[in-house]
Amino acid sequence: DILLADFGISLSYSALSSILKNAGFESPKKKKIRHRTHRRKRKPHPGQFIQIDATPYEWFGDRVKYTLHGAIDDATGQVVGLFLTQNECLYGYLETMHQCCMDFGIPQTVYSDNHTIFRSPKTGKLTVDELIAGKTIHLTQFGRSMHELGIDLIFAKTPQAKGRIERLWATLQSRLPVEFAKRGIKTLSEANRFLETEYRKLFNQKFSVTPEAEPIFVPLSKGIDLDSILCVKHTRKTDAAGTFSFKNRCFQILD
């Protein structure tokens, strides 16, 4: 791709591989004996099923690992969000979903692993008072955000169940470091700007497929304040004096 785009040289993969091998360059990817597995059929509608995950990698080629958060549409293979942070975190996932909702719309379902960012360890452990109050499940901050947007959040039981996004990581790990190096990108802010404004579009043009049916992403209505949903919220009670505590600090509500 780079030879064609930057130098106008068109070579087949096998020809290029042979040239590099004869010059003493071996592929960094270890070849493994692969057992054939049955790939799940794609969902028909774009927006019906979004896989979300994160992967640590040496994206800048400096032996320091950063974590790339991403989301991919099952029907088209389009990357709907990418965001790079130091470690896997809620912020990275919320930014990824912000891109998805702004650029494509609100999806029907988000499919994740069982990380505590997505699934509370207290799931299924409601107290009697919580049951009496009508609470049915413990939600994480991410889960609460999805609930407010009307998105169903379901969890994968095994890494193999997230095959589509696992294959995305393999592709990005072989391509993104080269793209960063070409452009002299060495910081998180530079990388995230490139990912959101340029790379997602380039990637989707090359790798996305035509869906079987019409998109069912729900467009954002004018009344939705996305920043007030994709955020962290805490509930506190005030005392008779109109004060409440948060993280060992006391706050006074003014009239």
Q: Where are the regions that the model predicts?
A:
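Cysteine/selenocysteine-centered motifs that mediate thiol-based redox chemistry or coordinate metal-sulfur cofactors
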Residues: I106-T123, E130
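RNase H-like two-metal-ion nuclease catalytic core shared by retroviral integrases
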Residues: S112-N114, T127-R175, L188-N192
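Mobile-element integrase/transposase regions
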Residues: K21-V79, Q86-Q108, G143-E148, G242
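C-terminal, beta-rich DNA-binding module of retroviral/retroelements integrases
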Residues: E198-D255
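Short, charged, surface-exposed loops that flank catalytic or proteolytic processing sites
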Residues: D53, E179-L195
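Basic, flexible linker segments flanking DNA-binding modules
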Residues: D1-E58, V128-I137, E214-D225
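Residue-level detection of beta-strand-connecting loop/turn positions
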Residues: D62-R63, N114, N248
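Short, conserved catalytic/metal-binding motifs centered on acidic residues
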Residues: L16, D53, G77, V110-D113, ...
